[in-house]
C-alpha cells in the first residue's frame, strides 16, 4: 500500500481516484496534481514507481493545504466566527444549519435525533 502525506492509498484504484482519499484533495485537484507531475491518471497505485510517488508528494506538499493543517484551519475559522458573534458563529454554537437551510422540517443531521414533545393533557 502506497503512503502519501500520511495517508495509505488503496493499491488497486486508479491514482486519480486514490488521491481523493487525502483530505483536501478532490477529483479536480487530483487531476491538477497529475497533470503538473506528468503522471498518467490511468495507472493503478501499485504500478507507480518510487520516483513518481516522490514527485506527487512534493507537488502536493508544495501547493496545497491538506490533512491536519486544513482541518486546523477550518476549525480556527469556525472558532473565529463564534468569537466575533457573527450569525454563522451563533448557528455553529447552537448546532443548527449555518447556510440558510430550512429548520421547520429536515435539518435532522445537524439537530440530532428527534425529541418527542408531549401534547396537552385533556381536562376532565
UniProtKB/Swiss-Prot annotation:
Cross-referenced InterPro entries: Rbsml_uS13_C, Ribosomal_uS13, Ribosomal_uS13-like_H2TH, Ribosomal_uS13_bac-type, Ribosomal_uS13_CS
Region span, Disordered: 89-124
Pfam families: Ribosomal_S13
One GO BP annotation of this record: translation
Stretches with biased composition (Basic residues): 101-124
Record keywords: Ribonucleoprotein, Ribosomal protein, RNA-binding, rRNA-binding, tRNA-binding
GO cellular component annotations of the record: cytosol; small ribosomal subunit
Domain of life: Bacteria
Keyword field contains Ribonucleoprotein: yes
One Gene Ontology term of the molecular function aspect: tRNA binding
Family according to the record: Belongs to the universal ribosomal protein uS13 family.
Self-association state and partner proteins as the record states: Part of the 30S ribosomal subunit. Forms a loose heterodimer with protein S19. Forms two bridges to the 50S subunit in the 70S ribosome.
Function: Located at the top of the head of the 30S subunit, it contacts several helices of the 16S rRNA. In the 70S ribosome it contacts the 23S rRNA (bridge B1a) and protein L5 of the 50S subunit (bridge B1b), connecting the 2 subunits; these bridges are implicated in subunit movement. Contacts the tRNAs in the A and P-sites.
Name the UniProt record assigns to this protein: Small ribosomal subunit protein uS13
Organism: Nocardioides sp. (strain ATCC BAA-499 / JS614)
Amino acid at each position: 500500500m502506497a503512503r502519501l502525506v500520511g495517508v495509505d492509498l488503496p493499491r488497486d484504484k486508479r491514482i486519480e481516484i486514490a488521491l481523493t482519499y487525502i483530505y483536501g484533495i478532490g477529483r479536480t485537484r487530483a487531476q491538477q496534481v497529475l497533470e503538473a507531475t506528468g503522471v498518467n491518471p490511468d495507472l493503478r497505485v501499485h504500478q507507480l514507481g518510487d520516483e513518481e510517488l516522490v514527485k506527487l508528494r512534493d507537488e502536493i506538499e508544495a501547493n496545497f493545504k491538506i490533512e491536519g493543517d486544513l482541518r486546523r484551519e477550518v476549525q480556527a475559522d469556525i472558532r473565529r466566527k463564534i468569537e466575533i458573534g457573527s450569525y454563522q458563529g451563533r448557528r455553529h454554537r447552537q448546532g443548527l444549519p449555518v447556510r440558510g437551510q430550512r429548520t421547520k422540517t429536515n435539518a435532522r443531521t445537524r439537530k440530532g435525533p428527534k425529541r418527542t414533545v408531549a401534547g396537552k393533557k385533556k381536562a376532565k
